Each structure stands twice: as structure tokens, then as C-alpha cells.
Amino acid sequence: MIPIKTPKGVFNVWTKRIGNNPKVKVLLLAGGPGFPHDYLEAFESYFPGEGIEFYYYDELGNGNSDKPGDSSRYNVASAVDEVEQVRQALKLDSSNFYLFGHSWGGALGMEYAIKYQNNLKALIVSNMVASGKEFNRYVQQVLVKQLPPAILDTINDLSARNDYSNPKYSELVTRHFYARFICRLPLDQWPEPLNRAFSKVNTPYYLTLQGPSELGIIGSLQTWDISARLKEIAVPALFIGAGYDEMDPEHIKWMSQQVPHGQFLYCANGSHLSMYDQQPFYMNGIIRFIKEVNNSSAN
């Protein structure tokens, strides 16, 4: 456990190291906001065989970490500060520190890369756009129109009544939105680590930043926008988009073009969790990027 200093005291966060490579150390940031590391266990089937050292990490309040119940920390600045404290404790530096972030973790990774890039070797942003506004645009203008009209009417009716706790709402969103855009594997074949992560989500964190639904951000992230600052990311950066993602892959491609040393990986048959529904292509693309960066710095 790593002690994290906060304005309300010191609390412990959980990390776990897999592998041993002094030149390549990857810290994995989970999505949500509020999801634990569990669903990132997919990396265990790929990274160890390539000699890549990596770290699981549960943000304060999530998963195996302490749960102080301090909602004042549910913001971007506090999360970035926490990642820096974790980096220091793990003794990662610009010679070996690769930061991976999926979804919300990608937003956190970009913010960290701008503030602390002297500590960073490379950045991997998976399935995340550059603003809450862009997320909402794509969901409302493109994705919800792909849902059956009767299903969408019911979802919208429940939303209008703020009846998000209705079992019907979660059933319809899971069956018609999640199964299309979050993970395209049949629902009864979703991997155990993914189901486990869903069962352990830090709901207050999710509600504060995202809001009650994936069908649009109405929490504090709706005003978050890093678009104009992408050019400040100086380290090599890989951006990953997918054909069936809830995030617009064309926008993610644009993001990669704003970064001086950006690359784009497109998972044509994947969704928000391409790490599961287009796994070999996704994982091999990340491994290739890590090896490229490592080899270029060795020359």
C-alpha cells in the first residue's frame, strides 16, 4: 500500500507489480470514473510474455484502496496529484515510466502528461476523447440513433423522470447500449474480471464526474476540455480508437495529430473495451508502440 497525502489526512492506495524490467514500467489507470483495476487484468495475458513490467493501481476510494468517503477529491486536479504521489512511491521516472489510461484513465493520463511530463517516457490514451462536450455530441448525434426507437423512447422517458435506479433502465442500457458500444462480446460471455469491476464501481465518484448514465455526461466532466492543450504533450503518445466505441474514433485520430509525437491505433472491430472484443490487435498495437519508444531511446 502507498500512503497518499490529502488535505483530510493520509490514506493508503493499493498497487500491484507484475514483472520486472528496469527499462519499461507501465502504470495502468482504470476508467469509470470509479472503476477498480480488475478489468485491466486482460494485460496479464500479453505484457509478461513481452517482458513488460506493469502496475495495477486503484485510485483512492476505489477497489482495494482506502475509502475515506471524501467527495471533495472527486476532481481532475486531485486525481492527477494522486498519480504523481504513486509515481514517486514506485520510483518511476522519465527513463522507464509509461502511463496507460483507459477512458477516464485516459483523461487523467493526458492531464498528468501535461503537468508532469518531465517524469514521463511515453503516454498511451485508450478510448478517450478530449472533452465532455465531444463525448456528448457523439453519443447524442450518432450512437443513440442506432438504438431501436421504442427502446430509446423508454430510456429517454426514464431519464426525464430521473428514474435511473429503475431496474428497467439499467437492463435496457446494458442490453442495447453497453452490448453495442462498451463490449461487443455476448453479455453472457463478458469476462469475469470485467463483471467484477462493474460490481465494485465507486458509484459516488462516477456520479460526481460522469452523472447517472453513459448516454451523456451531466457531471463535472461535461465542462472538461483538454483539446487546446494537446499540443503541450511532448512525449511519444499513442491514441487508441475503435469502430464501435462510445467515443468517436475520428476525433481520437484528430487528437493524435495534435500531439507532436502522436500515433493512432484504430481497432475497426472493437468497442470501448477493445482490450476484450478485439484483444490481439489491441494488445499487439500497444506492445509495438512500447517497443518502438524503448528501442528509439536506446539508440
Swiss-Prot record:
Active site: 103, 245, 272
InterPro entries: AB_hydrolase_1 (IPR000073), AB_hydrolase_fold (IPR029058), AB_hydrolase_sf (IPR050266), Peptidase_S33 (IPR002410), Pro_imino_pep (IPR005945)
Protein's name in the database: Proline iminopeptidase
Keywords on record: Aminopeptidase, Hydrolase, Protease
Protein EC: 3.4.11.5
A GO molecular function held by the record: aminopeptidase activity
Species whose genome carries this gene: Chitinophaga pinensis (strain ATCC 43595 / DSM 2588 / LMG 13176 / NBRC 15968 / NCIMB 11800 / UQM 2034)
Catalytic activity, as annotated: Release of N-terminal proline from a peptide
Lineage: Bacteria, Pseudomonadati, Bacteroidota, Chitinophagia, Chitinophagales
